[in-house]
Amino acid sequence: MQSEIRDGRICVSGCVSIQTLNDKQCRLFRNQCMQPETHSIDFSGVTRADSACISLLLIALRERQGSLKLIALPESVRALAKLYEVEEWLDI
């Protein structure tokens, strides 16, 4: 997984899975969420996602109290959010 801020969006790309997500990437994502210019998270570059992506979303929710807009959230992550009954928290 890679993430970078572009035009106020955190652009997430690559595979976001429990096999690929590590502590360094989580810390970077958390710091990106805390930046005042960040207003949304764009998942359009994600090639594969599993429950690790839910963890990222919960980090964003905690850091910004749900104020970040989610763009192009993968359908697999939407399904997991529904399964875990957190879709209302994530406003999806």
Please provide the spans of the model-predicted regions.
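STAS-like cytosolic regulatory interaction modules
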Residues: 1-52, 59-92
